[in-house]
Every structure is written in structure tokens, then in C-alpha cells.
Regions:
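A short, charged
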Residues: 62-78
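Compact, charge-rich alpha-helical regulatory domains located at protein termini
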Residues: 36-67, 91-93, 108
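Domain-level signature for proteins that mediate thiol-based redox and metal-cofactor handling
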Residues: 7, 14-17, 65, 80-81, ...
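C-terminal structural segments of small proteins and small subunits
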Residues: 73-111
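Short secondary-structure boundary segments
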Residues: 7-9, 69-70, 90-91
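Short, well-ordered secondary-structure micro-motifs
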Residues: 14-18, 49, 78, 99
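N-terminal first-folded block
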Residues: 2-43
Length: 111
């Protein structure tokens, strides 16, 4: 399973970013191997409506699960249509911590 976590920095030791569409980075973690790949947000400086376009990026990368803090309305609708599951993380911890809590079933499912 591939997990995408919105992040303030590159890598699993970076802090989780609460804002979905405005996250500077997206860290994709393979839940089996633990390997990760970080993608910089190409739409970070765009004006409005980036949420659905970010969803397209995440789906293209093959994410089954998204962990983030907050979602806008358009991103929520697009994520629902994509079939990805979305979980809330608001503990100001690292990407690695968010993934661990997801695996333990300790995150609240949003979608």
C-alpha cells in the first residue's frame, strides 16, 4: 500500500503539513518496505483551486491513502471520486509518526 503524507520538508523525518493543497512536499511511503519518495509541490505558489490538481498528482503516483490535516471542499470532492482513503493527522509530528499511527489504526478517517 502506498501512503501519501503532506509534509513541511523532504523525507519521513519532516513534520506533517496540515494544509493539503499548500503542503510544500508530499512524501509517499510504501507501507510494506518502508521506502519513501518525496515530491515537491509544483503548485505551491499557484493562486486558487490547487486541491483537485494535487489530487491528480497523488493518484498518478499511486497513493491508496492520504494523511493530512485539512482539506478544502474541492479537494474533498476530488479525493472522494478518486477512491483514495483520507485520514486526519493533527499531532504536529513527523511523517514517520503519522504513518506509524495509521498502521496502528489511531487516525480518524475523513474519506
Amino acid at each position: 500500500m502506498k501512503i501519501c503524507v503532506t509534509s513541511k520538508g523532504a523525507g519521513t523525518d519532516s513534520l506533517v503539513e496540515e494544509r493539503f493543497g499548500r503542503a510544500p512536499y508530499f512524501v509517499f511511503v510504501d507501507s510494506g518496505s518502508g521506502e519513501s519518495v518525496t515530491i515537491e509541490n509544483p503548485l505551491l505558489n499557484e493562486s486558487g483551486g490547487v486541491g483537485p490538481r494535487i489530487v491528480q498528482l497523488i493518484v498518478k503516483e499511486g497513493a491508496d491513502v492520504v494523511i493530512t490535516g485539512q482539506l478544502g471542499g474541492n479537494a474533498t470532492t476530488t479525493l472522494q471520486a478518486s477512491g483514495a482513503k483520507v485520514f486526519a493527522y493533527g499531532d504536529n509530528g513527523t511523517v514517520a509518526d503519522a504513518v506509524a499511527k495509521f498502521k496502528e489504526g489511531k487516525l480518524r478517517q475523513l474519506i
